[in-house]
């Protein structure tokens, strides 16, 4: 159904763009555009008010059960238990907990598949406040206005589908041009002490406002949207003590660049990074958000800062004084207990200390965000490693570094370059984080500073950070270098070229490096040549935490739901969106003699498994996007990407074509991964695509948290080698069997049998991390099937527990009773917390 056009004049009308913007059509809705929060409208304020009213009671119950000092992360986790009557000391890194988030969110590439899965539930509306932000599908090319015009036309089908779903089921809808989702959430939805789920790995950005926000796949999000329990392995806790105060060129970005180098891309797996210490109070809220955002690059579940005055200032500046007033009432419990801060090693699983006063700016890369280099070492490292020295593009922005403060610090460097007659040698692109920031920067004359250096100001969208970039500078077929204030620099991520060496830095360092155009330049020590031939040294950057005149008022952007019974039909010719058919359930038999699809060597991120760029528009069409499966995965047997052996045709082809051949001939297959397989983004397509192409098993040395969860939710058996050395036993033409599946159980290994080409066999053990409920998901074949079974088997939901009554009751006395027939058939399907309303259809 085509919805009426909505003028984006209010989104893009600025001093420089009003004439060009005119009226850009979008497919959002005919509903009223809501102004931004500074006008006094706080979305879902009743929910926030109830949260702060109940928080002390819930925390008292937690303290009564645990009887010990608590970290901030523990306070939020335990007060969000779905079944507080089952409260106990959950073992970190081992036990699973069921949680009840406060908010949810998604975007235009994670949203379609999540909503497609939600449609199968039969629910009439979502069960918790949620928002859809269209930020991923805008292709960066000519600039904000022309790029948004192209996006509206080329992404019509996706935007229309999301807008209809939002209007019908209850999502707030932010059309393209409104901002990058994490900045939109920070400005409008995040609040201290709350919990949020979003289908994006950089969701932890909200930790800058003291919110526990976690990136998930679409199936996990649907759990929350349906009011069901959302399950998480109880995270370990990494405490990061910050002391001192940042000096000179050092920025919040350098805190996380250094920390990522310390922890590596897997050091935070199944852990929450919690910052504490007096150094936290010297950082702005958006600076904290930058640090939390990129904590995802360590594999961390999320990151969080304690509530403080900087958060108050930010909330007030974005129209949320009422939230500040509520948070102040529980402020002492929006941070770790004093005993924890005094003796952190006793309460955190690992403690890292960073002295902000001595922190040096960093440049991390290339090809991995944990390749950390203090800026004083970059020149020597570049020459040692043979990095291409010329910087061909400088990119400022992304969800990591697009706040008002970020852009003002970069603008101060740019202004000095203009004033001192320094010519820029590298093309610059600037991405403000939201329309509010865009218009405020425009009002304050700061975007014109960049334009004077011939910078391209892009739309408030993800753009080059996720590969949505029509790059026209330099020759990408040869090794080349770019520098960016983004969060990830995996091969091929930004421009699709695996030859591009991408380096991560703060916005001000990126701006300074653009002047010399050389990765070996150190702006702290080096000089630049002015037009008059003088050697000029750049002064330290200066920025503004928040705009002195406040943010621009009356910024429109949000379309509110109307709950109309809009038709959600999808045309069979729609290339962007197609509804799902249920995957087949497990047949009860062992997997026997399955062919190896690929044995991946080295780093294999979700960008390798399901690349972005040109494929992003097809995230809502599982058949179409499955053509990119493991396009960038390196085959351990030939060292090449996109070339694997087909055991049936006896020829090499792409992983997608080989998997599709097997599927068409009713043959399942196996993927073997290296260490930290599936690190990076939360994209569930990296699990859904192999499931769709009948991959039955993923066996790896280790699995990244979100990807492992997505594999489980999509019905793929996710295994790890009991002995990582067994990875070397697997040969290219092996047949792989997984034995003992009829007896698979929590904490019990399975047997892997290899049948080599010569007929010889080898056996070894593999581990899994499934609990009883997750095994039932796997047996059922996929989560939507699980939801339907759950409705069919569940008993009426119990009344929601009274937290106050739980303080002295033992956990054993609070266990739920489950009908015996249900337990016998599906031990994991306990009473369902609210699905006795007849809204789910039977199988």
Where is each model-derived feature located?
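Non-catalytic terminal/interface segments that mediate subunit docking, oligomerization
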Residues: 118-120, 350-441, 565-697
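C-terminal segment of N-terminal export signals and the immediately downstream linker at the start
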Residues: 26-60
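Phosphate/diphosphate-binding loops
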Residues: 329-340, 441-527, 702-703, 714-749
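Acidic, glycine-rich flexible loop/linker segments
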Residues: 528-545, 707-777, 781-786
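Mobile "lid/hinge" segments at catalytic clefts and subdomain interfaces of large enzymes
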Residues: 199-322, 468-552
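N-terminal export signals
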Residues: 2, 10-30
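Accessory "access/gating" subregions that flank catalytic or transport cores
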Residues: 163, 175, 180-194, 298-424, ...
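Long, structured ligand/cofactor-binding scaffold of large enzymes
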Residues: 55, 60-233, 626-671, 676
């Amino acid at each position: 159904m085509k919805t009426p056009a909505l003028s984006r004049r209010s989104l893009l009308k600025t001093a420089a763009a009003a004439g060009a913007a005119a009226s850009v059509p979008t497919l959002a809705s005919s509903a009223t555009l809501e102004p931004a929060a500074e006008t006094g409208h706080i979305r879902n304020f009743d929910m926030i008010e109830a949260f702060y009213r109940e928080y002390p009671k819930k925390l008292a119950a937690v303290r009564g059960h645990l009887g010990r000092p608590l970290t901030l992360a523990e306070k939020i986790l335990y007060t969000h238990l779905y079944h507080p009557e089952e409260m106990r000391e959950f073992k970190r890194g081992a036990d699973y907990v069921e949680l009840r988030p406060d908010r949810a969110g998604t975007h235009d590439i994670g949203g379609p598949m999540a909503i497609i899965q939600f449609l199968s539930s039969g629910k009439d509306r979502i069960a918790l406040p949620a928002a859809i932000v269209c930020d991923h599908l805008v292709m960066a090319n000519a600039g904000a206005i022309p790029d948004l015009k192209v996006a509206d036309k080329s992404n019509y089908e996706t935007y229309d589908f999301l807008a209809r779903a939002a209007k019908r089921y209850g999502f707030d809808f932010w059309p393209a041009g409104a901002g990058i989702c994490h900045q939109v959430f920070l400005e409008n939805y995040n609040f201290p002490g709350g919990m949020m789920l979003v289908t994006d790995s950089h969701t932890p950005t909200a930790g800058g406002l003291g919110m526990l926000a976690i990136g998930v796949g679409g199936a996990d999000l649907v759990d929350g949207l349906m009011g069901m329990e959302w399950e998480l392995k109880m995270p370990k806790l990494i405490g990061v003590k910050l002391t001192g105060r940042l000096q000179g060129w050092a920025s919040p970005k350098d805190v996380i660049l250094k920390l990522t180098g310390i922890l590596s891309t897997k050091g935070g797996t199944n852990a929450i990074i919690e910052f504490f210490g007096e150094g936290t109070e010297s950082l702005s809220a958006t600076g904290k958000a930058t640090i939390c955002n990129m904590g995802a690059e360590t594999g961390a579940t999320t990151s969080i800062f304690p509530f403080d005055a900087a958060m108050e200032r930010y909330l007030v500046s974005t129209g949320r004084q009422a939230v500040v007033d509520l948070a102040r009432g529980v402020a002492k419990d929006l941070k770790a207990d004093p005993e924890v801060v005094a003796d952190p090693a006793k309460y955190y699983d690992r403690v890292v200390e960073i002295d902000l006063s001595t922190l040096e700016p960093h440049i991390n890369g290339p090809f991995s965000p944990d390749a950390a280099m203090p800026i004083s070492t970059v020149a020597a490292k570049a020459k040692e490693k043979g990095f291409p020295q010329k910087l061909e593009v400088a990119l400022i922005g992304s969800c990591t570094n697009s706040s008002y403060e970020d852009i003002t610090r970069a603008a101060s460097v740019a202004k000095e370059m203009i004033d001192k007659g320094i010519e820029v040698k590298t093309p610059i692109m600037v991405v403000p984080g939201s329309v509010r920031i865009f218009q405020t920067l425009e009002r304050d004359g700061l975007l014109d500073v960049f334009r004077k250096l011939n910078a391209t100001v892009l739309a408030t969208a993800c753009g080059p950070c996720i590969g949505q970039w029509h790059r026209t500078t330099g020759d990408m077929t040869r090794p080349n270098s770019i520098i960016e204030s983004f969060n990830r620099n995996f091969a091929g991520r930004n421009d699709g070229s695996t030859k591009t060496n991408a380096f991560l830095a703060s916005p001000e360092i990126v701006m300074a490096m653009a002047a010399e155009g050389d990765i070996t330049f150190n702006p702290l020590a080096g000089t630049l040549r002015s037009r008059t031939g003088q050697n000029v040294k750049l002064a330290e950057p200066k920025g503004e935490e928040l705009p002195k005149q406040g943010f621009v008022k009356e910024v429109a952007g949000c379309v509110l739901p109307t709950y109309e019974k809009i038709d959600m039909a999808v045309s069979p010719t729609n290339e962007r969106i197609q509804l799902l058919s249920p995957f087949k359930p497990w047949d009860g038999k062992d997997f026997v003699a399955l062919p190896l699809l690929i044995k991946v060597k080295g780093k294999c991120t979700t960008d390798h498994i399901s690349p972005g760029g040109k494929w992003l528009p097809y995230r809502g069409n599982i058949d179409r996007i499955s053509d990119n499966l493991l396009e960038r995965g390196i085959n351990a047997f030939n060292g090449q990407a996109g070339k694997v052996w087909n055991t049936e045709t006896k020829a090499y082809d792409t992983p997608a074509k080989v998997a599709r051949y097997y599927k068409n001939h009713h043959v399942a297959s196996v993927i073997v991964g290296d260490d930290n397989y599936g690190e990076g983004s939360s994209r569930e397509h990296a699990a859904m695509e192999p499931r769709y192409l009948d991959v039955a098993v993923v066996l790896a040395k280790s699995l990244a948290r979100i990807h492992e969860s997505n594999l489980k939710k999509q019905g793929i058996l996710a295994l790890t080698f009991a002995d990582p050395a067994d990875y070397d036993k697997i040969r290219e033409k092996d047949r792989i069997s997984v034995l003992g599946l009829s007896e698979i159980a929590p904490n019990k290994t399975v047997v892997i049998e290899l049948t080599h080409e010569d007929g010889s066999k080898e056996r070894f053990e593999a581990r899994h991390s499934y609990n009883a409920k997750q095994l039932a998901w796997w047996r059922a074949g996929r989560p939507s099937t699980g939801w339907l079974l759950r409705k069919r088997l569940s008993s009426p939901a119990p009344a929601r527990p009274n937290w106050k009554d739980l303080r002295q009751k033992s956990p054993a006395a609070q266990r739920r009773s489950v009908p015996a027939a249900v337990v016998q058939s599906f031990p994991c399907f306990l009473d369902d917390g609210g699905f006795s309303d007849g809204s789910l259809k039977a199988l």
